[in-house]
Structures are given as C-alpha cells and as structure tokens.
Amino acid sequence: IHWHGIILPTAMDGVPGISFPGIAPGETFTYRFRVQQSGTYWYHSHSGFQEQTGLYGAIVVDPKEKETIQYDRDYVVLLSDWSDEDPDAVYAKLKKLSHYYNFNQRTASDLIQEIRAKGVSQTWQNRQMWNQMRMSDTDISDVTGYTYTFLMNGQTPADGWVGLFRKGERIRLRFINSAAMTFFDVRIPGLKMTVIAADGQEVEPISVDEFRIGVAETFDVIVEPDDSAYTLFAQAIDRSGYALGTLTPDASVRAEIPEFDPVPLLGHGDMGMDMSSMAGMDHASMGHGAMAMGSMPG
C-alpha cells in the first residue's frame, strides 16, 4: 500500500521491488510509522492493477492543535473510475491502439467548419502537425466513459452520493481524485466553493466556481448552502461521463443535473511547442495537471 502524500520511512512506502520486497500471496505486512502531518490524503495499491480494481481509500488526519478554519460538517468526496473490463485487457488495447477508447474523433464536418473559421492554410498546418505526431487534438483521455463508470464515494451517477446538512451550516468537502486515469472538472451549480487546502496542505483561501482535479490530487473546500439541494457535478475532462452527488437538507430532494461543458481540444501549448513561431494561430490551453479555477481574482 502506498500512502499518498504522507511523509514516512522508505521501507513503509509500499512499492514492491523498490521500497520493500512486496507481500506474497497469503502473507501479511504491518505498516508502522509516525504520522507527522495533518490533512486530506489517500492510500492505494502499488501492485499490478489492484488500484483500478478498487484497492484505494481516503485518509483524514486531524491536526493536534485547534483548526484555524471552522466548519460544522465534514464530508469526504472520493472520485474514481471503474470498468467492468479486466484492467489487463484495457492496457493491452491501449498498447495496440492508443486511441481505442476515444469516441470523439474528428469528422469531415469538423474539417469543413474549421476551414470556414480559420482558412485552408491554417487548418492544413494544424492537421499536419497532429498527423506528424500521430496524435489527435481530441486525445484528451486515454480511457473514457466508453468503458468507465465514474463514481463518487463508490456510487454511480444513477444512484448518486448524498450528503445531508442543516441550513446555516458550513460544510467542509474533502475532494480526492482516486481515479486511475481520469481528470475531473468539479462544480456545484449555484454554490461558491472556498478552497482551503491542496494535497493536504493549507492554502490561502480562495473562492472559485469550479476547479480541475488531476489524478491523485486532493482539494478541501468550504461551502455554505442555504436550504436548497445542490448537485456535486464532477465531469470527466473529455466530457464522456460524470460522477454525481447531492448536498441536500432533505434526503428526498435532489437538484437538477447540469449540462456538460463543451468538449475541450488540445492546443499547441499542450504539446510544449514554441508559441512565438506560431503568431496568429489558435492556442487553446487545457492546463493539464493545474487547478483550473473559475472567478479567480487577478
């Protein structure tokens, strides 16, 4: 088991063949170490594809001293992706055809629209660049909702996770992305979120409408709902599906599910290309691995 984000001795890090010999079938291993930090973290297997098949979970370490930020209710929001396919089969397909699960490929209609918008020359240069790299600007995620179901605290979108609250409460939501492959764009329509921690470390509070959470990241936010129901909407970065939850004062009341945001496309900047040599071209930026926030000051 790897204790993600926790400072500990190398021998307790849980990486077979590197930090320790591993745990043989039928055997046990006891992890012992002093916890030297507080915050929101998580654990997961480092053996084969065990993480993809469910060996992961949340870790919340309370501080020794009184917390600087006060709240009335505390929820973990564990995001993940699940496939009924054997992970070895998924991996084998990707090795043979990297875009096997990409069902958002460019069409002839897209080509015509791009020519109308940018002209033949720029469209040709753009397509040539991607073809030379044997890639597509729609290659947002290697594995998509074609095989994945996206979960929130183990619940599918059909069921949805439910968090109850009373009017006037300040709620701490500890978002953890324990997915194997998926980035999520998270928002709660009608409700501002104040980010107070990232990867277990306190940050200067900042109010946002949404944020992007990469694989293995954690973000803690504070929300202050009224007596309405709110949807926790975590859409996959490629818009092939979503994880769903509800904050509500009444378990029988649900909020509307919002529409997907537009499907993003990769740009030259995502490939690390020199923008200065491409003046006038459309450089859409995805911001992979970064916290994409709405309504950020400055």
Predicted regions and their residues:
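Histidine-centered copper-binding motifs that mark active-site loops
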Residues: 1-187, 191-215, 222, 245, ...
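A conserved active-site cap/scaffold subdomain adjacent to cofactor or substrate pockets
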Residues: 176, 220-231
